[in-house]
A protein has these predicted regions:
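Canonical Radical SAM [4Fe-4S] cluster-binding loop centered on the CxxxCxxC motif
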Residues: 1-46, 280-282
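Hydrophobic pocket-lining residues within nucleotide cofactor-binding pockets
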Residues: 5, 72, 295
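Short, solvent-exposed loop/turn segments at secondary-structure junctions
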Residues: 9-11, 25-26, 72-73, 99-100, ...
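Flexible mid-to-C-terminal extensions adjoining Fe-S/redox cofactors in radical SAM and related proteins
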Residues: 24, 28, 276-277, 282-343
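Pocket-edge positions in alpha/beta enzyme catalytic cores
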Residues: 35-39, 70, 292
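Radical SAM/AdoMet-radical enzyme domain recognition
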Residues: 41-68, 75-200
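Short, flexible loop segments at the rims of nucleotide/cofactor-binding pockets, characterized by
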Residues: 70-71, 255
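A C-terminal junction/extension of Radical SAM enzymes
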Residues: 151-283, 321-341
Length: 343
């Protein structure tokens, strides 16, 4: 998958159009000028042309392109940008917080247009704005497209249970039998989670995962609608943007990210608006220093050379991270510059 940042603004303060928004924190050192907040179509075209000429990136794009940010729907050019990246892949998705005031919003109109062009909209559920903003528009989205991924970012198991119940109530209200498999999946998720909470409320992460058993996180419905839910633990992040080694729901466990790039396989590449690339799945952190070239500035040959150099650097750093975890030095940054939780 290619995860491409198309917008720096996170719409934390202004929900409909970008006037007084702040920049998504990990991008602050990179995008100081307001003019750089939105990716422009010309930049997208240049990226697309370069991706076509670099086989590893071309292969990742064919699998999936995820347009993200910040809040991707804030970009006034997002429909045109979607069309450009659609020439690379039949599977282009856009992630949104769906914190939108109404169907009259330009942001909403952009999302609708993307679904009409066969793009997919995925969301992160936010309970604080669920009833007033997300729920009414999600009803529309599930009629406009044939699938949905919902991310649940949880601070505790009780918080996760509340969010699962929100989804159960939502799909129970839909007067369509095709969503019954989704309810069956969510009911099973809820039952297993409740058992864990009742029997071991302060459980370790392994206990939580064992309680979930072999439960899949996705299901197919009659008519082809595919639903997936991702439960993602939340982390404390310092004002400097450094993430804790432990998650909020599982404070006793060092949270490890098993990076495939360390093992010589790139399954995801995150591309910033500046063109900088990192094979990092943790797009909320972006602190991995080994870079894989600049998609806008570097030649295909230079990029492929940097791929090899940075993979070796990451493998060395991951090895040191593992040793640090064994010797009570977890959290110490190594000279290779990969985050201390990446192995």
């Amino acid at each position: 998958m290619l995860s491409i940042f198309v917008e720096a603004s996170c719409n934390r303060y202004v929900r409909d159009e970008c006037r007084f928004c702040h920049v998504y924190p990990p991008l602050k050192p990179i995008l100081g000028s307001r003019e750089d907040w939105h990716m422009m179509p010309d930049t997208a075209r240049l990226m697309a042309e370069k991706i076509r000429s670099i086989v590893p990136l071309k292969d990742l794009a064919k699998k999936e392109i995820n347009l993200t940010g910040g809040e991707a729907s804030q970009n006034p050019h997002i429909v045109e940008i979607y069309k450009i990246f659609r020439t690379l892949s039949g599977n282009v998705r856009l992630h949104t917080n769906l914190d939108i005031s109404s169907e009259k919003s330009k942001r909403w109109e952009r999302l609708v247009e993307i679904t009409r062009l066969r793009g997919r909209i995925d969301i992160t559920l936010y309970p604080t704005v669920w009833e007033s903003r997300q729920q009414p528009l999600l009803r529309k989205i599930i009629q406009l497209q044939n699938g949905l991924i919902v991310n649940l970012i949880y601070e505790s198991l009780a918080d996760l249970l509340r969010q699962i119940n929100i989804l159960i109530d939502f799909f129970s209200d839909q007067d369509e039998k095709k969503f019954i498999p989704i309810l069956e999946l969510l009911d099973l998720f809820r039952d297993r989670l409740k058992t864990t909470i009742e029997t071991n409320p302060q459980c370790r992460e392994d206990d939580f995962l064992n309680g979930m058993g072999d439960l899949e996180n996705y299901v197919s419905c009659p008519g082809g609608f595919v639903f997936a839910v991702n439960a993602i633990p939340s982390f404390y992040v310092s004002p400097e943007g450094i993430r804790d080694m432990t998650s909020l729901p599982f404070p006793k466990d060092v949270y490890k990210v098993e990076c495939t790039a360390v093992r010589g396989v790139i399954e995801i590449m995150t591309v910033l608006q500046t063109g900088e690339m990192t094979p990092c799945c943790d797009v909320g952190n972006l602190k991995c220093k080994p870079k894989f070239g600049n998609l806008l500035a570097d030649s295909p040959e230079t990029i492929l050379q940097k791929f090899g150099e940075s993979q070796k650097l990451m493998a060395s750093g991951a090895s040191k991270n593992i040793e640090n975890m064994k010797t009570d030095k977890a959290g110490k940054w190594v000279e290779e510059g990969i985050p201390p939780f990446c192995v």
